Amino acid sequence: MAGHSKWANIKRQKARVDAVKGKVFAKVSRQIIVAARSGADPAGNFQLRTAIEKAKTVGIPNDNIERAIAKGSGQLNDGSQLEEIRYEGYGAGGIAIIIEALTDNRNRTAADLRSAFTKNGGNLGETGCVSWMFDQKGVVSITGSYDEDELLEASVEGEAEYYEVIAEDDFQGVEVFTETTNLENLSQVLQEKGFDISEVEFRWVSAHTIEVSDPEQARSLLKLMDALDDLDDVQNITANFDIANKLLKTLAS
């Protein structure tokens, strides 16, 4: 949608801030720990391989990566056990929000999330209350120059569903979408065709996006997203709203 910044693009901006804060190290390390449960060899574990590549991209030292793999695969036992949990809730104006968390204490995480929602005009709901508004997809992000005919051909070969050209200040490239079960195949095909892949991920994609034009609602939503993202147990946040770039700049000033 021209002139608008989708939540995925807002998340990219936040990711850069998180990287400066060092917060991204902890989140990616946790992804490695969970992925390594299915096997410590990245050659046979696509989820682990993807997490390791992301860790290297953000500059996590190899020693930290190896330690996370050892912890996840059971070679290093510190007594803690991370659990993957999905939470769902509503922001100001009924905006749907999905939170993916990794936690060793689900009671603590639920309490922290409930507090963040309550303080920022939202409420934590029951599992399933908003996830029906989203589909989970596999997404391959491509940066750099590309030939669109070659991209279309590779997307068909890799069994992609569709792709979107992204032209934002913080990201110039293409996002290619597929079924989650086909993500490994698609990323491999695109890599073999020589495309510059910046990220491979699973993402919740909303069927219908709500445009937020009211400044107070937008401010409340962004404060809620920040509060949720600041929680150590939170790995990923997805919401079904857009905010016009002009309004975003006004709120940031």
From Swiss-Prot:
It comes from the Bacteria. SUPFAM superfamilies: YebC-like. GO terms for biological process: regulation of DNA-templated transcription. GO terms for molecular function: DNA binding. GO terms for cellular component: cytosol. Keywords: Cytoplasm, DNA-binding, Transcription, Transcription regulation. It is found in: Cytoplasm. Disulfide bonds: none annotated. Transmembrane segments: none annotated. NCBIfam families: PRK00110.1, PRK12378.1, YebC/PmpR family DNA-binding transcriptional regulator. Belongs to the TACO1 family. This is Probable transcriptional regulatory protein Tery_2125. It comes from Trichodesmium erythraeum (strain IMS101).
